[in-house]
């Protein structure tokens, strides 16, 4: 989640493009709380209560950045991500403008089938792994799943290794 937030903020600050950060970790949504936002509505409201997406989107204090927050835990997250309404939302957000970048924050790949369910709606995947937490077997399983995707890179998170002092 922090990697998705940092990526979205960086893209919004470095480009003349709008960036929409969508919290699709529906089992453990954290984007709004990490950004200090208090949403009146969330993606759950859009998906289950017919709240228009315009009422869900928030504008934090970062120029060019919009956030579609999650708010409460949804037990049927895979079903929600596979729904027609989610497909329409993904298409709507992506086609908002040719210069709009949409960053989807997803739950861990192997903990639920949410990412697999949502894969048809993404153009590219940035894989985040945690040093000393992600197992080799999980990396191998994930690599098999990514063969069908445009994997643009891997981020090593929680690294404690330091560069040599003569690095620069």
What are these regions (language model features)?
Residues 2-168:
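P-loop NTP-binding module
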């Amino acid at each position: 989640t922090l990697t998705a937030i940092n990526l979205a903020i960086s893209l919004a600050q470095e480009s003349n493009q709008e960036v929409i950060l969508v919290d699709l970790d529906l089992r453990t949504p954290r984007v709004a709380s990490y950004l200090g936002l208090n949403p009146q509505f969330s993606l759950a409201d859009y998906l289950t209560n017919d709240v228009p997406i315009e009422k869900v989107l928030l504008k934090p204090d970062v120029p060019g950045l919009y956030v579609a927050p999650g708010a409460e835990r949804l037990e049927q997250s895979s079903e929600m991500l596979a729904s027609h309404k989610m497909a329409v939302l993904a298409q709507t957000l992506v086609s908002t403008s040719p210069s709009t970048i949409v960053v989807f924050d997803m739950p861990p790949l192997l903990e639920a089938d949410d990412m697999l369910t949502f894969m048809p709606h993404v153009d590219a995947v940035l894989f985040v792994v945690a040093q000393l937490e992600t197992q080799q077997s999980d990396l191998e399983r994930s690599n098999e799943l990514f063969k069908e995707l445009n994997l643009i890179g891997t981020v090593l998170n929680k690294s404690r290794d330091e560069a040599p002092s003569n690095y620069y």
